[in-house]
Amino acid sequence: MSIKTNEGNLIASGLKFGIVVGRFNEFISSKLLSGAIDGLVRHGADESDITVSWVPGAFEIPIAAQKMANSGKYAAVICVGAVIRGSTPHFDYVAGEVSKGVARISLDTGVPVIFGVLTTDTIEQAIERAGTKAGNKGYDAAVTAIEMANLLNQL
């Protein structure tokens, strides 16, 4: 008896991807977007198969991601943005709701909706995760999207 194993590959050619970007903290989210596009293209995606939708902030990401996921056009939807802690509880509400919303959309639609939204305590932490010391989390989200899209095609 042999065990069947499913594992997604990292080949993006022939797949279409949606990316939702929160404009708030654009100096970070634009770097995450660049990283996501770079990740997709490096793995074989054609730029014409990538659609980017900008929303005002992280809180608005789930509704745009849901619309894209429900459209049937995309193998996966990547969500990027930055929520940076301030001196009020606003951070906790926004970070919690966007993460729950993204997870729910993925489960409800069966489309991989990838959480690439930074939730950091400081601007410095966000900068580190948007292409400096800690890599680019937008790139990482793109690689995850490719793998999950290919995995779900096998299941």
Swiss-Prot record:
Pfam families: DMRL_synthase. Keywords: Riboflavin biosynthesis, Transferase. (2S)-2-hydroxy-3-oxobutyl phosphate binds at residues 87-88, 129. GO terms for cellular component: cytosol; riboflavin synthase complex. Gene3D superfamilies: Lumazine/riboflavin synthase. InterPro entries: LS (IPR034964), LS/RS (IPR002180), LS/RS_sf (IPR036467). The active site is at 90 (proton donor). 5-amino-6-(D-ribitylamino)uracil binds at residues 24, 58-60, 82-84, 115. Its EC number is 2.5.1.78. Pathway: Cofactor biosynthesis; riboflavin biosynthesis; riboflavin from 2-hydroxy-3-oxobutyl phosphate and 5-amino-6-(D-ribitylamino)uracil: step 1/2. GO terms for molecular function: 6,7-dimethyl-8-ribityllumazine synthase activity. It catalyses: (2S)-2-hydroxy-3-oxobutyl phosphate + 5-amino-6-(D-ribitylamino)uracil = 6,7-dimethyl-8-(1-D-ribityl)lumazine + phosphate + 2 H2O + H(+). SUPFAM superfamilies: Lumazine synthase. One of its GO terms (biological process) is riboflavin biosynthetic process. NCBIfam families: lumazine-synth, PRK00061.1-4. Belongs to the DMRL synthase family. Catalyzes the formation of 6,7-dimethyl-8-ribityllumazine by condensation of 5-amino-6-(D-ribitylamino)uracil with 3,4-dihydroxy-2-butanone 4-phosphate. This is the penultimate step in the biosynthesis of riboflavin. This is 6,7-dimethyl-8-ribityllumazine synthase. It comes from Ruminiclostridium cellulolyticum (strain ATCC 35319 / DSM 5812 / JCM 6584 / H10) (Clostridium cellulolyticum). The lineage of its organism: Bacteria, Bacillati, Bacillota, Clostridia, Eubacteriales. The gene is ribH.
